[in-house]
Amino acid sequence: MSQTQATLDDRTLRGAGFMLLGATLIQWSAAIVERVFPVIGPSASSAWRFLLGAVVLLALTRPNVRHWTKRQWIGALALGATVAVMNQCFYQAIARIPLGSAVAIEYLGPFCVAAFGKRSPKHLAFVGLAGAGVVALTRPGNGLNVIGVLFAFGAGLGWATYIFASKRVGGTTKGFGGLAVSMSIAATLTLPFSIGTSARLVESPELLLRLLIVAVMAIVLGFGAELQGLRRLKPSIAGVLLAGDPAVAFLVGWLLLHQAVRLWDIVGLACVVLAGVGVTYDSSVSESELAQ
């Protein structure tokens, strides 16, 4: 193995490690924040997560934005708006349906972007497999809240956009300055949801501490790790790793929230994950053949 190949392999392994770490921290933080929902609700919880996370990131990075280009600002604005909508929808979803089911449905967003990018018969088969997975997860009698499912689909649309926006911010800014600005924009957009709950946080330091932990885990460490992973990985490899997010969510929901995992849930999860891995792998093979 040449030195260049070894460097690339090391870079890929580090990127994969960052992606797995980011997914675990984000889903773990979702399990923690669910216990705050009965007190201040999912919308306010999301808003405080962005506000506290942005404050921590700004304090740590102190981004110098005076010399930012228009392209950098557009990227940060796009990422901030995207994660604001995505997380609001996601928190509304997990307040109504199990964490694993919500993430599996949400994953259809980036999956469809990859699948419909190339309309080959194989890709259509993978779309059918993913569709079967969603039917298994949301089948009549499964007890899933319809509004929660719709919010999960909304979060999926946000996730699809997030992939492009985060890649752009990671490619046009250095360090975590771009992430800090993006999260500040998200905090500003969701600020109205947090205003009415300020008194409760003042009265309950424990609640404020829990939200701070969630903010650090999800935004500072989770999003930060994903950003580092996306900087190091090819889109095809990143796509395969993202397909594992629903499995991580089901595991976290089962271990930390004691959410039941039924046979149909496992079948649905397997269909969605296999479809995601398949469509990503097929795309990467097609790109390699075209390059030769």
List each model region and its residues.
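Juxtamembrane helix-entry segments on the extracytoplasmic side of multipass membrane proteins
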Residues: R11-G15, V39-S43, A47, W68-W73, ...
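Specific alpha-helical transmembrane segments that line the substrate/conduction pathway
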Residues: A44-V55, V83, N87-R119, A155, ...
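Hydrophobic transmembrane alpha-helices of multi-pass small-molecule transport proteins
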Residues: L57, L108, K122-G141, V252, ...
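Transmembrane alpha-helical segments that form core, pore/gating elements
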Residues: L57, V113-A114, A130-A132, G141-S198, ...
